[in-house]
Curated annotation (Swiss-Prot):
It catalyses: UMP + diphosphate = 5-phospho-alpha-D-ribose 1-diphosphate + uracil. Belongs to the UPRTase family. This is Uracil phosphoribosyltransferase. It is an enzyme of class 2 (transferase).
Length: 208
């Protein structure tokens, strides 16, 4: 599995701000979107381009355009919505597929409760977004759904990832690509990433 920890100074700085204990909902939400945008920039660096001729201000001009690769952004509800706008800043024509999976607080197992995928998802590259890759259960379950629907070009974008989640994802889906702003130390006894970001969903939606 291709694993990319984005080490750009802007990414590291913004993620550091997100780790502050007393950060406001507004600021956390803004930074989640901004880091999501920067991760998208990295994840789409290998998209193929082609030369096309357009009418420029001085006549015909040859330019580069993305070559036919359709994209669907797949936020995992609910926290993934906090990164979606940042992703769409880079790929505004992408279609949106939504998957609802939550983690049972006692068993730590993923529980699916909603999915709405674009009709031609088998023709698209999926950018799956979720702030945290902890145990990996929710992400694995989401990718299971995408592959069952015929989508096999999948990239995962997360703000922080635990080594345990990375290992689980690689074992279940070695063909996907992972882009993260940080690979953190690991999980605590409750299954939360340390040092992590706390409960990203609560911080994004102001329910902390």
């Amino acid at each position: 599995m291709k694993i990319v920890e984005v080490k750009h100074p802007l990414v590291k700085h913004k993620l550091g701000l997100m780790r502050e204990n007393d950060i406001s909902t507004k600021r956390f939400r803004e930074l989640a979107s901004e880091v999501g945008s920067l991760l998208t920039y990295e994840a789409t660096a290998d998209l193929a381009t082609e030369k096309v001729t357009i009418d420029g201000w001085c006549g015909p001009v040859e330019v580069d355009q993305i070559k036919g690769k359709k994209i669907t952004v797949v936020p995992i509800l609910r926290a993934g919505l906090g990164m979606m706008d940042g992703v769409l800043e880079n790929v505004p024509s992408a279609r949106i597929s939504v998957v609802g999976i939550y983690r049972d607080e006692e068993t730590l197992e993923p529980v699916p409760y909603f999915q709405k995928l674009v009709s031609n998802i088998e023709e698209r590259m999926a950018l799956v977004v979720d702030p945290m890759l902890a145990t990996g259960g929710s992400m694995i379950a989401t990718i299971d759904l995408l592959k069952k629907a015929g989508c096999h070009s999948i990239k995962v974008l997360v703000l922080v990832a635990a080594p345990e989640g990375i290992a689980a994802l690689e074992k279940a889906h070695p063909d996907v690509e992972l882009y993260t702003a940080s690979i953190d130390k690991g999980l605590n006894e409750q299954g939360y990433i340390m040092p992590g970001l706390g409960d990203a969903g609560d911080k994004i939606f102001g329910t902390k």
